[in-house]
Regions:
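Hydrophobic alpha-helical segments of integral membrane proteins
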Residues: 2-10, 58, 62-66, 239-246
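A structural signal for short, hydrophobic/glycine-enriched beta-strand patches
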Residues: 55-228
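Membrane-embedded alpha-helical segments of integral membrane proteins
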Residues: 1-31
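Hydrophobic membrane-insertion alpha-helices, especially the h-region
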Residues: 41-56
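Structured C-terminal subdomain patch of bacterial secreted/periplasmic proteins
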Residues: 227-252
Length: 252
């Protein structure tokens, strides 16, 4: 098994919800017969964690912990000479003839198209094959969506990357031949800080164009404490990025 895939499986099961919560619940059940008090404590802790992580109050707070990025405006473009849109995921959609971009990728493409129209900058889409054997690449799916739904054509396709670090290094290789060292980077808010760090490492200065900027948590309202699957998914994404940021700091 590929070590990168194995690492992702371990992280998903042991560190990220809902996998980590399921593991904790199973552990609580297993030990409750021999150590009832400890087992109940684990079960209650996992249940409370599941509720909290399923609220927008917690998912929004976690997202804000990943960085501090304002909405993009054309005046912020500075020395940028290109727009880089990062892939996220893909879906099997028979109504679209097979593979197509997933919801997160589509959100990034939508903002990337808006930035392109506001600035006139050319677009690079970055994303390899989601799984071995997939065809086409995510970059090719993004190109198709930009053409069909936004009437835009990316100038460059980076089709080999498998993670954010490779998004950065391989995009930099392409843009270096065009003497471009500053880009507008389009990705989700909670993914932005780590992405910008990796792009800087690769030699590209990035101007942030974040998608899905967290809402304000004050004043407190019912919608922020009502559990929802979407909030749990957002908590998972934010925790994934916080772990990634911590790993980057440990590397240096």
């Amino acid at each position: 098994m590929d070590l990168g895939l194995l690492r992702r499986i371990v992280v998903d099961l042991l560190l990220l919800p809902p996998g980590s919560i399921v593991v904790a619940l199973l552990l609580g059940l297993l030990i409750s017969k021999r150590w009832p008090r400890t087992g109940r404590a684990v079960l209650w802790s996992a249940t409370v964690a599941l509720y909290l992580l399923s609220t927008s109050l917690v998912s929004t707070t976690l997202a804000r912990m990943t960085g501090d990025h304002a909405a993009f405006t054309p005046s912020a473009v500075g020395q940028a000479k290109a727009i880089v849109i990062l892939a996220a995921e893909q879906n099997e959609a028979p109504e679209y003839g097979g593979l197509t971009v997933g919801d997160l990728t589509l959100e990034r493409l939508r903002l990337g198209a808006k930035v392109a129209r506001e600035t006139g900058l050319p677009i690079l889409v970055s994303g390899g094959k989601f799984r071995p054997g997939d065809d086409p690449s995510m970059a090719r799916l993004m190109e198709r969506t930009l053409h069909d739904e936004f009437r835009l054509e990316p100038r460059w396709l980076e089709q080999a990357s498998q993670d954010t670090r490779e998004n950065a290094s391989m995009s930099a290789q392409i843009l270096r031949t065009e003497h471009i060292d500053t880009v507008v980077l389009v990705t989700h808010y909670c993914h932005m800080q780590r992405s910008m760090q990796l792009f800087e490492e690769a030699g590209l200065h990035a101007v942030a164009a974040p998608v899905d900027i967290p809402q304000a948590v004050l004043p407190l309202r019912w919608s922020l404490i009502r559990p929802a699957l979407s909030a749990l998914e957002e908590s998972e994404l934010a925790l994934h990025e916080l772990i990634g940021l911590a790993a980057n700091r440990l590397r240096f």
